[in-house]
């Protein structure tokens, strides 16, 4: 791992660390970093953790964004390790994670910080994620788990983003972008990255924070725009995603749910397995990664099976 030590060891006070895990998305990362430069909030540092990109990401950072703290993995370890490394390198009172395929609205960081400063019981706050290709439509505004099956229910999908202005939405977890309170992260500890290396690793830490007694909320007045294909559907599930989707969910609820909720999840596990097998077939793939993820989850096998 390569790290610019001089930036990390600086004694300059920083309110927010903006943390960006990345892998082979040089142009999207450049666009995100430029959107951050336009932020109305100025007391921040940026930490980019590169999971061994081969597309010139490092050269782009060194040439165009010399103020960024750049950490590079020599070989891929997946995103949970990248998030842990960003937290370890961070200096801010708040840590704002944003995935590399986003654009951040200029007022988003300021609004999240202001809200968290005024609400000390909030451990994690997130902006609304809107579609980059359709900026007025909500992609998701956080998620909650259903009481029995523990199904992840994304909130407000398809709603006009402007309708959420002024709302504070209580949630269980988020994807894509969110701001942690440092105190909450330190109490929760790092993501067990060999156990949940990808697909739900951020939710694992967020829900652990909620279990400590903090609130997790989505702030309707803050927005990011996620550059994802709304028509991709089952095609986004390659073998790696199929495997970790099921294994990580098993570990998540096994580790973090109280006994009654965990029992409901276990009873529902055949439904999840059947669903991911259907997704695999619909995407033109075999079901072997799904079955392997199921077996490894049940047997408690950790580690990086796909990278």
Regions found by a protein language model. Give the residues of each.
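Glycine-rich, basic loop-to-helix element that forms the pyrophosphate-binding segment
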Residues: 73-90
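Non-catalytic, C-terminal membrane-associated alpha-helical segments of glycosyltransferases
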Residues: 240-245, 258-307
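A short, conserved alpha-helix in the catalytic core of glycosyltransferases
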Residues: 172-180, 184-189, 194-222
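Conserved donor NDP-sugar-binding/catalytic core segment of glycosyltransferases
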Residues: 107-147
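Short, acidic, metal-binding catalytic loop of nucleotide-sugar glycosyltransferases
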Residues: 34-43
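Short aromatic/hydrophobic "clamp" motif used to bind/position activated sugar donors
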Residues: 95
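A conserved acidic beta->alpha catalytic loop
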Residues: 35, 50-59, 75
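Short, flexible, basic/aromatic active-site loop/helix in glycosyltransferases
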Residues: 145-171
């Amino acid at each position: 791992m390569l790290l610019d030590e001089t930036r990390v060891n600086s004694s300059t006070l920083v309110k927010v660390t903006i943390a960006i895990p990345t892998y082979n998305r040089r142009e999207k990362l450049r666009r995100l970093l430029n959107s951050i430069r336009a932020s109305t909030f100025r007391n921040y540092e940026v930490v980019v953790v590169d999971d061994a990109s081969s597309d010139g990401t490092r050269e782009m950072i060194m040439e165009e964004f010399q103020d960024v703290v750049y950490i590079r993995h020599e070989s891929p370890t997946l995103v949970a390790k990248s998030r842990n490394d960003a937290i370890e390198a961070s200096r801010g009172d708040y840590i704002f994670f944003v995935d590399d395929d986003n654009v951040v609205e200029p007022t988003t960081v300021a609004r999240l910080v202001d809200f968290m400063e005024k609400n000390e019981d909030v451990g994690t706050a997130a902006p609304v994620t809107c579609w980059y290709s359709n900026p007025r439509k909500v992609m998701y505004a956080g998620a909650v788990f259903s009481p029995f099956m523990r199904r992840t229910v994304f909130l407000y999908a398809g709603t006009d983003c402007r309708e959420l202005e002024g709302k504070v939405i209580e949630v269980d977890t988020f994807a894509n972008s969110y701001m942690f309170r440092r105190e909450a992260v330190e109490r929760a500890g790092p993501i067990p990255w060999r156990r949940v290396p990808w697909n739900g690793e951020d939710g694992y830490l967020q829900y652990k924070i909620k279990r400590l007694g903090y609130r997790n909320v989505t702030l309707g007045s803050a927005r990011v725009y996620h550059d994802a294909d709304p028509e991709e559907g089952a095609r986004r599930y390659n073998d790696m995603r199929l495997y970790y989707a099921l294994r990580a969910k098993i570990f998540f609820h096994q580790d973090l749910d109280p006994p009654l909720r965990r029992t409901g999840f276990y009873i529902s596990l055949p439904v999840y397995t059947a669903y991911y097998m259907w997704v695999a077939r619909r995407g033109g793939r075999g079901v072997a990664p799904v079955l392997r993820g199921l077996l490894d989850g049940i047997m408690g096998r950790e580690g990086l099976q796909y990278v």
